[in-house]
Amino acid sequence: VSSSDSMILLGSGQGIELGRWLLRRNDWSGPLVELVAPEHGEPLPDHMAAAIASEDRVAVLAMGDGSACRTEKAPGYLDDRSIDFDNSVADALTAVDAATLMNLDQQLATELLVAGRYVWPIAARIVETDSGNWRGELRYRDDPYGVSYFVALWTSVGIPSTTGP
């Protein structure tokens, strides 16, 4: 992040507030574009697409929780479907699997109280806008308070390799 020219903060509800706090705590002083995540399937907002397409190094802080149904004391109580759902999100975040993140089951995500259900598809579209290769790393995953939290780092690693004859 420190080598980035500008920052896009993407979230919904409390995610934006938490993102601001994280940026202040880490002394971010560069340009900041904030975007409250629109509903799944909406196009990438023009100002985000322009920022990603620019020559600047842009960092994206995408804030969104997984399911809130991981334990009996969770906000949504225990729902066994949350295990497979959150595992698939963790795998997609690790693999920078844009297709999986853009095609989340929105009905199930709503039932599982997934705050990231609108955020992750937009982050995935950002990756798809870039022609480079991406590397993912899941740095944190836990379920405190029955809510699934992920911290993943996606890094652009340059132009795509070409294969073929």
Language-model segments: which ranges?
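A general structural motif
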Residues: 4, 55-57
